[in-house]
Amino acid sequence: MDKPKQSFRRHFKPIRRRFKPIRRYLKPIRRHLSPIRSGDRIDYKNMSLISRFISEQGKILSGRVNRLTSKQQRLMTNAIKRARILSLLPFLYNEN
């Protein structure tokens, strides 16, 4: 009845840990210049500004294409929709 005690750790393979290499330098932060200047207001009446963020088919361009922040993109989308409702902008552009 006397059994020799076996080591508990002997039955498991050792876990090899992979360490991340230490970065020698930091990557420079790239700042994209916003296409909206500080003086420009995002407003449904500002047609010269709004027309830059609409495709040729009349679709609202995405934030990645526009290089806008999420807040600016949200305000721009609302301004475009208001301009469409007030018939300042067409909903669809003709293909002619």
Curated annotation (Swiss-Prot):
Entry keywords, A to Z: Chloroplast, Plastid, Ribonucleoprotein, Ribosomal protein, RNA-binding, rRNA-binding
Record GO cellular component, one term: chloroplast
MF GO annotations: small ribosomal subunit rRNA binding; structural constituent of ribosome
PROSITE patterns per the UniProt record, alphabetical: RIBOSOMAL_S18
Swiss-Prot/TrEMBL GO biological process terms: translation
Subcellular location as annotated: Plastid, Chloroplast
Keyword Chloroplast: yes
Cross-referenced InterPro entries: Ribosomal_bS18, Ribosomal_bS18_CS, Ribosomal_bS18_sf
Record keyword Transport present: no
Similarity-based family: Belongs to the bacterial ribosomal protein bS18 family.
Listed PANTHER family: 30S RIBOSOMAL PROTEIN S18, SMALL RIBOSOMAL SUBUNIT PROTEIN BS18M
Quaternary data: Part of the 30S ribosomal subunit.
Protein name: Small ribosomal subunit protein bS18c
Organism field: Pinus thunbergii
